[in-house]
């Protein structure tokens, strides 16, 4: 279950003893916080029971070629998370990026040991387009085989889901789960 950071402790208590993991989002949904804020928010969420971290990348920094900012946030968040046995999903917002920027985001994710690259926050009303099969295929081609790819954003049907899996997605994020499963 993925929740906002302020609910990490409550979710961890409610789910204690179950197989359901607590995931929390960091710098959601825009990713514009400074690296030190993201690192602190991550450490706090982990201390309160989060087992997975969904970090929204600073897209503005990436697009402005301020890779030092992205490096700093990734280094700190991955170190804090892996130190507690948690995985990190980096949300890169592919609908806002060029192909070259997607490639660069994947390079930075690999450099810092991100576990899963995620296409989007899914806030598609704010984005110029939804996640595409081509986005997933490009990410899959640019990350190591053991790095996961999570497709999210605009996935509403069984056909959408199967196309994303065929393109290389190892996880799907969708709010239409019941409809997707019903179509199988």
For the regions a protein language model found, what residue spans apply to each?
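Alpha/beta enzyme core
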Residues: 6-149, 157-184
